[in-house]
Amino acid sequence: ESAMQGFVTTHSHEVVRNSRISQLRVLRQVKPFECCLYDLHRFIDEVIKPNQELKDLIEFYDGFYAINFPDIIFADKVILYEGDTERMLIKNALLSERFEALRNQYISFVQVGGAYAINYKPILDYLNIKSLIITDLDFYADAETESDVVQSLSTNATINAFAKEALKESEPSVQVLYSWKDNMKHVAIKNICLAFQGINDHYARTLEEAMLAKRYNMSALDTKTREEWTSLRKNDKLKFVIPQKVDS
């Protein structure tokens, strides 16, 4: 048997996908002409395995590893988002002159639900990648008044996990989350910025609700008949789903 050891440098996604995560060492630029080596074998052995709360992530990483892991480790920055609405919003926002510098960087876009975005935090922290998570506040759907909303809780695991770390509250009320977002220029922990609906988004649970509420200058808690929504949609030539009537 040969005792030879060696290494291969690559930018190939396929090479990365066909290697074990513990075999990877990532070189990332930290300053002009200066790189830092990130050892993913140590990441698994020293960050994930010793932490009882993170041990289940080993199976998760094995699953997402073959999908978008290469996009993350090669990226300058990462944007994690929930669905098609966020994707289209990001795509159009990046066309603005304001974000010209971002267009010249390698940004990885990862579609992931609010329940799972938190799973990416350890690897993003370890690789020190500046990241943005766009997710929905998702307070309980039975909250029908402003008072109900501010007393409600978020069902979003990612928001709750960030709040637990930053605010030391495992189940913060929506009012607490509103204040957290309102009192900071950016809700961020280390290198990760977290974006969700705030008090200025008209009590919306989701990005779609916030956009419609702003468009029609209304609260997301306001009600309209199906006919009124149909008329608005037709007049504005927009495409959005109007819920069917609920049988009593």
Residue spans for each PLM region:
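Loop/turn-to-beta-strand initiation segments
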Residues: 2-7, 130
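Acidic, divalent-metal-binding catalytic cores of TOPRIM
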Residues: 16, 29-248
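Conserved catalytic segment of ABC-fold P-loop ATPases
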Residues: 18-26
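Short, structured coil segments at secondary-structure junctions
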Residues: 2, 19-20, 127
